[in-house]
Every structure is written in C-alpha cells, then in structure tokens.
C-alpha cells in the first residue's frame, strides 16, 4: 500500500487582489522577503536559501529562476513543475547562523502567483520561533488556484493556524509570535502534474496587535452524559509568555446546535482578563445539561459561542455534546448483528457514505472534518506520525480524533489504521521484526504467530485497533520492489505463515478483538500483486509494481488465490485490493484493475470464499481505474470495495458517492451491505464501549520480552547458503575483521517501512546493529566499513553487505535499483576474502547476484532484513543457535533468469528454493538406502496424520542430500530439491523424500 505523510493545511481561503493594491497611509512600507532576482541562492540548511523536498525521489518539484516579460516585479520569477504522488514542495530557510527575522510590525504576507485555474490548494507554511528553520514551530494556511494569470494574494497572519499533524520539535508555545521568523514553505498539490510561477514575496500592512495574545480552549468537544455538566477552560496566552499588555474580554453564550432549549440551561456572560494578567491564566465556563423525558436519544450539540476582544479568538467554537443514550445499538449485551441493524436503520445516506470514507490523519488537521463529514476512518500513511513520535503522542493524537467523532449524531467511533508490517514500524522505539521474507525463511508458523502477537500488542497500546497486514502476496519476480513483503514464492509457504493472522486478531471468531493486545488484520493485496510482469507497470518510473498479472484461471487459483482462502478461513477482518491489473487468459476482458474487478471481489472473495469482513481500498487505489472520478467511485463500490482510502480527497469521495446513489448508479442495498460490514468490525473491536486508547500495554513497547521474540525470529531467518571448511559458526576467541556497508546500520538492516514509508539508512530507531551484537561475542574485533584498515593478523573476516532501504515500486529493478552489490561492497568482499577466510552476510530484501564471487567466499548467509535485533544474527554466527533457515525464494544465477520459481520447466538457480545448510552439531549420515527407509517412514507418518514426525523425516532427508551436494548445484539437482520443499509444505511427506532422493542421485 502506498502511504506517505502530506501537509494539508486548514482550508482558509485568502483574498485575490487586483494588480494595483492600495496601502493605508499609516501602513509601513512593504518589506521584501523574496524578489527572485538572484538575491537568494538555491541552498540547503544550514545555509540560507531555497530548497526542494518530497516523499520520494520523484516528488520534489523542479525549480528555476526564469526571465519573464510579464514578471509582476523585476525581470525574473521562480518557476517550476511538479508531479507528486506523495508530498512535495519547497522551502526558503533563513541562514541558521544569522539572527531570525522580526515580522511582528506587519499584518501579513503576500505573494504573486500565476494561476492555472485548476481548483487545487497550495499550502503556505510559516516557521516561527525555535533555534532555526528546521527546529521551529510551524503555522499553516492555504489558498486555492482558481484563477488564471498573475494575482497578488494577501494572507493576514491571523489566517495561519498551528500545524497539528507535524511539528519538527513538538511545538514550542503554540503562539504565532512573529518576532523570530525563520522562513516559509509552499506545499504543492498531489495527484496530477502541474506547473507554477511565483514572484514578489513580501510583508505588508500594519500589525494586528491582537496576535500578541490568543484565547484558547482546552478542547473543541466536550461530551457529557445527559444531565451532566461540561467544564470549558478558557485560557489567555501571549507570545513569549509575557503578561498581556491590554485587557482581553471573552463574551460567551450558548446558542444554536442540535439540542433543544429544554436540554440545557442557557448561559450568557463575559470573562475578563485585565492588563497585566499572566500568560496561561485560565477561567472556566460550566454548561449544565438537563435530563428530559426521552428515554432514548441520539447525541445533541450545544455550541458555546465565544466573542473575543483584544486577542485572537479560538479557531473553532467549542461544542458541548450530550451523549447518545438508550438506543439499542449502544447496548453491549445485544448480539452484534442486532446492534448493526439498529444503527444502520437510523443513519442517513450521508452518514453511511461517511462511514465508507477513510482520510489521512494529516489531511484533517485538528479533526473538525471528522465531525463535518461523518468520517468512519483515519489512517497514518508511512511516515505520518505525531510529534514527538512516542507511544504517548500516538495515543493522545488518536484520542483527539475519536473525541471529534463524539460530536456526530450517533457517535460512531473511528477505526484507525496503520501499516505495521514488521512490528509497529511507524513508532520510534518499537520492536521491529524481520520483514516477511525473513519470517518465511524461518519455516516456523508458531514463531510467525508470536511476531504477530507482539506487533498487535504494541500497535493497540498506542490507540490503533487496525493493522494493514499481513501481505499475502506470492512473489514471483525478485525485481519487484515489494518482494520482501512476501513470505515467499510458494503459495503453500505463504499459507503456512498465516498463523500471523491469529497473532494479530486472536481466535477466528473474533472474541479477543476487544482485548488491549489484539488488532484487526488485513489480508493484502488481493489478487495477484506478486505476479506482475516486468515492464508492465504504467505508474511513474515503476517497472513492475502495480503492473499486470497475466494468468489462467487455474494458475490464479493455485498460486495467488490460495492464501486468501486460508485467510478467510482464519477469520481475517479486512481485505485490501491490489493496485495491479489482472488479465485472465481467455476471459476476453484484458487487463482490469483489481479495484474494479467485481468478479473477483464480489464473486470470488465475498461469494465463493464467503468473506464476511470489509474490503478497504489501497491509497488512492480507485483513482487508477479508467474514467472520471465519479466513475471510479461507482465502479469500485459496485465491485465490492466497502471503504475507500481517499487520503486527501475524502470530501470529494463522500460527495461523489452520495450523488451516485441518488442517481441510481449505486444501490442503497450495496451501501447498506458495505456499512454493515464496517460497523460489524467496529462493534467486534469494542470501539463503541472503549473508543479511546487503552495504554496499559505501553510499557511493553520495545520491552525485553518483545525484543526477545524479534531476536529469535532474526536468528531463525538466517539462511546459510555456503559454509566451506566450517567457517561458521565463529569462535569467540577468534580475531575477527568486520567490513561492509550494512554491518553497523540499523536503518539498512530494518529496510523500508521503518519509521517512514521508504525507510532510511542510519540510526533511525533504537536497536542493535549486527556489528554491535558481534562485539558482545568477540574478544578481538576490528571494524572497517570499507576494508581500508590493515587485514593482517585476523583469523576470519565477516563482510556485511546488501541493499539500502526502499519500498514498493521505488525499489523496482530498473527504477534506480538492481540486484548487484554496490561497488564499495564488492570491493570490501574482494579485499577481505582475498586476505583471509571469510563469511559474507547479505542484508537485503531479495537475493543479490554473487555468482561471480562465490568461489572466493567461504561462507555465504542470506540475512534478509532482520530488523532491530542484530543479536539474533550474532546468535547464529557464534553458534548460540544453529542455522536453520531455508530459502523462501529461489536464488538466481543471473537477472536474465528472472522470473525463476519452484516448479518452472527450466530451473537452474544458484541455490534452489528450500536450500539452507545447518550448523547443528550432528548432521545425519546416509545414502540411497537411508533415503528409501525415510520415504517409507514418511508415508506412514502421512497416513497417520503425524505431521511433526513427517516433517522431521523430510528434514533429515534434506540434510543428507545437502551434505552430499556440498554446493554442487545443477539443474538436475535443483528442480527435484525445490519440488520436495513444496511437497513438504503441502503435507506430502513421502513424495517429498522421494524427490530428495532424486536430487541425491543427480549429484
């Protein structure tokens, strides 16, 4: 799923002024900020200048100073182009080494903008206070490009609001002081290419003195039981926390809302804060609600109107909410189906459409739209985190959003979702598990379930009840940038690892979903995302991700559908369609986007498989369906998508859906089905009874117990591909030389989807690097990343190489990535392995091509992406645990072989699927006679239903065969060896041993 954080400011429209702007006689002269005549360089912090930024390599806009005859001021303008899928824009930071600027004498900021009349919003952000432009407090607003040609846009400073979705230092004083300004930023529209031109940024007008003081309330929503009293705290605050220098009055009055006069005691009065009042002084207003004769009512609102003199008023009118009560759907003792039916019967079409809408948390700002749009769900895209990124901040943020839902008529709680795909990977300090490719290598379903349980506990402890995991893709081409999200290339292996669903959700019947350590799981991406053909993608510069999967119906069922059959049997609560297109041979339809395939979503998933959860679209997934937006909405919902992830277009989606229903193009029955499915999961999660975060599990986040599970998983995921001369395990007495780019890098060993969407190299979250773990076990260790330190005098070398982080199509081969080691890593391998016995660890999300160096390497380990617990890798390197991992995918000899998978008619890999040497102290001896006896015993175990014994017999046969092969892998050997692994996973133990015997004979 594509997830990125995006700044979305409050929708505050500004004045669009004519070319000539009058200035009042007492206004100060405008002060230029940028003239774009070359006086400000393009430069990155800490230097002063203009720089671009974005969610990935394609998102930053292009910028240039262009000479224009029509430039509003001077000869040049700042112009550029953009094509942003995540987020992107540009910033002018003032130099860190120079004093901040004082803008407090002015009314606002204005600029010339060349309109394209595209109706899109441009966000403008100011950087106030703090140490510098990257450690300041952010204030934001926006204007709409709904005009053509040059216009001067004036934005009073009073229009800027505190940015709630992100603050680089967690906020400072929540007051726009204007005395220490560090620059500004513009965020450009997302979703379609565009161009822009900007000129003459300057300060204008005389300062509004009310900006120096602000009136705040402690909340925007105050829920109370009928007959209860709401206490509204009103606070005055000033820039720099100085006492107010002029009196501030706050007149208050209860007026309007949905409550009737008999529901509360009318209130009217005034609060006074005299000159000299200390900043932070608080007064209280109490609103008393009344019990009435109605035994059952929906929620009702009582706005408390505040009129402020002498200071900036709160951005919103606080709302007292008299909670819904007495209605059947609120009765936790009733069966879920009855609660759903009762609530559904009361809802309007607009409210139902809201439940089918999911927005990005950054898009809703303070959350007012949650109430206004009756939103059913929010998500955090990759990297969309609160500031600071702590468990406590996550819980506070989500609770603040849930509070907004309390102001809706039926107080339907939000369901909040995140991509916790290898632990709660969004949260700094969480336990980061190996990615799925490594979990598949463990061949340990019980361990997979335990990793899911740890993930669920840490996710739920931050207030998140829904995880967009697991990925059940069957990866068939390692050029795919999402290969590491798969458990492997064999559907039988993927199915065996689906115990993770129980780790996340608990038992199939969902009875534990209300618990504080369980979350709703999502099987993704339905259907065939791992089978797309290289070169078939039409998404930006992607080469394979989101492309076309071309299969027969038989292949579709056997390879790609099988894991979903298992997931439905396990009770998975939600399913997410794939961005990819499915082209079924012979059906005459050609490639059709999965979000539009009613035959697959309605027909197969909900019909044939009997899936009773709800279907959630991927990030802007419906936008890829051909046609206009109304058509996208109609097609996807009619195809069976129940909730649409419309991160920033959530209003457009809800409006379009209502219109499609009213036009008769989407039936109300289809809407009721979708909303029933969504409400069912919300009731099962216990959100109506406990909408707010239960943080009792927060102490377990990143705890020793949780990290022990991740450490065990990291150890079990290590696959020993070669071990000439018994180089591994290492001895603690040996003098070890360690080199390579991935030896000492938490970010690289964790991979993409770690803290941010793409992940990043470096010390991004607490953990133990492989080098740090090795130091704990070695009496004498030398580390030299590039192997430049002297190599003499060492007993053995360990070179840790591989990939840097990426996610999704950004990591596609041909999109700036390949399957080759970097030049620096190749040089380190060559130098160390020429000087001493060496072991090479490949830390990567997929196989890397090492055939040309294999003869020089004594030991080779596929370490995958082990996560934060490097101790697990050291455990097997030093023999604390044996190597037991097996390849979850085929390791190719060359890129030309791709795609290459178990069962292919031509199969000649470097290492076959299922290959994995062991460092157990006793590897069994034997030959053809032993293998024949093992086949007989395996057949008996199979007939008796003795799975553990059958698997043990196949394991013994495999070890015998691998011992004899000693790395001599030919096509005649590899094919039956890989086939045996598939047979093992499908419970055909005797046939698996016979295939291994065939491989033995081919050596």
In which residue ranges do the predicted regions lie?
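Long, charged/polar, soluble alpha-helical segments
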Residues: 924-1003
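Glycoside hydrolase catalytic-domain context in secreted enzymes
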Residues: 325-924
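Short boundary segments that mark the start of a structured unit
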Residues: 208-326
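Short, acidic/polar linear motifs in exposed loop/turn regions
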Residues: 115-117, 161, 240-242, 293, ...
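Low-complexity, Pro/Thr/Ser/Gly/Ala-rich linker/spacer regions in secreted
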Residues: 23-31, 202-216, 239-242, 309-334, ...
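Buried hydrophobic-core signal for structured, non-transmembrane domains
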Residues: 109-111, 184-186, 232-236, 285-287, ...
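Secretory targeting and sorting signals
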Residues: 1-24
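Beta-rich carbohydrate-recognition modules and glycan-binding surfaces
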Residues: 26-210
């Amino acid at each position: 799923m594509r997830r990125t954080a995006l700044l979305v400011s409050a929708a505050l429209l500004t004045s669009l002024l004519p070319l000539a702007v009058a200035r009042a006689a007492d206004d100060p002269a405008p002060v230029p900020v940028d003239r774009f005549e070359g006086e400000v360089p393009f430069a990155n912090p800490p230097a002063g200048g203009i720089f671009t930024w974005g969610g990935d390599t394609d998102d930053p806009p292009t910028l240039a100073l262009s000479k224009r005859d029509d430039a509003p001021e001077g000869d040049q303008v700042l112009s550029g182009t953009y094509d942003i899928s995540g987020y992107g824009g540009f910033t002018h930071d003032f130099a860190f080494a120079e004093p901040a600027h004082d803008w407090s004498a002015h009314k606002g900021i204005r600029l010339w903008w060349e309109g394209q009349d595209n109706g899109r919003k441009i966000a403008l952000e100011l950087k106030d206070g703090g140490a510098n432009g990257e450690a300041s407090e952010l204030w934001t607003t926006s204007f709409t490009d709904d005009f053509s040609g040059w216009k001067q846009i004036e934005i009073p400073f009073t229009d800027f609001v505190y940015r709630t979705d992100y603050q680089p230092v967690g906020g400072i004083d929540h007051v726009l002081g204007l005395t220490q300004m560090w620059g500004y930023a513009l965020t450009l529209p997302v979703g379609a290419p565009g161009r822009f031109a900007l000129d003459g940024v300057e300060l204008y007008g005389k300062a509004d003195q009310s900006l120096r003081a602000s009136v705040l309330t402690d909340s925007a929503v105050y829920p109370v039981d009928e007959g209860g009293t709401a206490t509204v705290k009103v606070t005055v605050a000033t820039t720099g926390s100085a006492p107010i220098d002029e009196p501030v009055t706050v007149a208050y009055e209860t007026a309007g809302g949905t409550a009737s006069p008999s529901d509360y005691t009318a209130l009217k009065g005034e609060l006074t804060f005299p000159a000299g009042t200390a900043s932070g002084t608080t007064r209280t207003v109490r609103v008393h609600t009344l019990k009435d004769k109605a035994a059952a009512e929906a929620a009702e609102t009582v706005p408390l109107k505040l009129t402020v003199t002498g200071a900036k008023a709160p951005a919103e009118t606080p709302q007292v909410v008299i909670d819904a009560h007495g209605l059947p759907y609120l009765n936790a003792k009733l069966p879920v189906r009855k609660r759903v039916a009762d609530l559904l019967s009361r809802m309007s079409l607009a409210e139902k459409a809201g439940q089918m809408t999911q927005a990005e948390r950054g898009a809703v700002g303070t959350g007012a739209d949650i109430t206004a749009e009756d939103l059913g769900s929010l998500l955090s895209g990759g990297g969309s985190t609160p500031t600071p990124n702590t468990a406590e901040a996550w819980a506070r943020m989500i609770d603040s959003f849930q509070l907004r839902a309390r102001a809706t008529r039926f107080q339907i709680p939000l369901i909040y979702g995140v991509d916790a795909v290898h632990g709660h990977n969004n949260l700094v300090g969480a336990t980061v598990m190996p990615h799925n490719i490594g979990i598949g290598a463990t061949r340990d379903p019980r361990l997979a379930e335990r990793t899911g349980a740890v993930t669920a506990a840490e996710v739920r402890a931050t207030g998140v009840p829904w995880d967009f995991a697991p990925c059940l893709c069957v990866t068939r081409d390692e050029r795919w940038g999402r290969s590491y999200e798969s458990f492997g290339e064999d559907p039988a292996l993927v199915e065996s690892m689906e115990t993770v669903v129980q780790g996340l959700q608990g038992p199939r019947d969902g009875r534990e979903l209300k618990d504080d350590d369980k979350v709703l799981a999502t099987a993704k991406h339905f259907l065939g995302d791992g089978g797309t053909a290289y070169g078939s993608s039409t998404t930006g510069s992607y080469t394979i991700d989101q492309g076309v999967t071309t299969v027969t119906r038989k292949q579709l069922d056997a390879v790609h559908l099988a894991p979903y059959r298992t997931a439905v049997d396990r009770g998975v609560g939600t399913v997410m369609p794939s961005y990819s297109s499915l082209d079924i041979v012979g059906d005459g339809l050609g490639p059709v986007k999965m979000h539009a395939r009613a035959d697959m979503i309605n027909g197969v998933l909900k019909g044939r498989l009997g899936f009773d959860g709800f279907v959630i679209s991927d990030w802007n997934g419906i936008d890829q369906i051909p046609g206009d937006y109304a058509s996208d909405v109609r097609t996807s919902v009619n195809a069976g998508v129940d909730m649409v992830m419309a991160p920033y277009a959530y209003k457009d989606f809800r409006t379009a859906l209502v219109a499609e229903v009213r036009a008769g193009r989407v039936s109300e029955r289809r809407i009721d089905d979708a909303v029933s499915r969504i409400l069912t999961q919300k009731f099962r999660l216990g959100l109506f009874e406990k909408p707010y975060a239960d943080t009792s599990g927060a102490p377990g986040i990143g705890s020793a117990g949780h990290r022990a599970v991740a450490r065990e998983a990291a150890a079990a995921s290590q696959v020993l591909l070669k071990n000439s001369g018994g180089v591994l395990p290492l001895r603690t007495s040996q003098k070890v030389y360690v080199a390579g780019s991935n030896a000492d890098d938490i970010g690289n060993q964790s991979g993409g989807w770690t803290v941010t969407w793409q992940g990043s190299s470096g010390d991004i979250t607490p953990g133990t690097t492989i080098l740090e773990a090795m130091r704990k076990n070695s009496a004498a260790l030398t580390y030299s990343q590039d192997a430049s330190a002297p190599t003499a005098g060492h007993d053995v070398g360990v070179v840790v190489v591989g990939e840097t982080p990426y996610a999704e199509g950004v990591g596609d081969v041909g999109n700036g990535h390949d399957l080759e080691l970097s030049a620096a890593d190749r040089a380190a391998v060559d130098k160390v392995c020429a000087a001493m016995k060496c072991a090479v660890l490949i830390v990567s999300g997929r196989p890397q091509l090492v055939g040309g160096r294999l003869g020089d390497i004594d030991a080779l380990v596929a370490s995958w992406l082990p996560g934060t617990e490097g101790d697990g890798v050291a455990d097997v390197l030093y023999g604390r645990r044996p190597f037991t991992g097996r390849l979850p995918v085929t390791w190719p000899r060359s890129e030309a072989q791709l795609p290459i998978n178990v069962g292919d008619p031509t199969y000649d890999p470097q290492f076959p699927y299922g290959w994995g040497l062991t460092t157990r102290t006793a590897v069994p001896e034997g030959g053809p006679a032993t293998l024949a006896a093992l086949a007989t015993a395996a057949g008996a175990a199979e007939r008796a239903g003795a799975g553990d014994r059958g698997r043990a017999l196949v394991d013994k046969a495999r070890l015998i065969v691998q011992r004899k092969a000693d790395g001599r892998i030919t096509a005649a050997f590899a094919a039956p060896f890989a086939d045996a692994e598939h047979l093992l996973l499908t419970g055909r133990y005797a046939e698996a041993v016979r295939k291994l015997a065939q491989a033995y004979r081919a050596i």
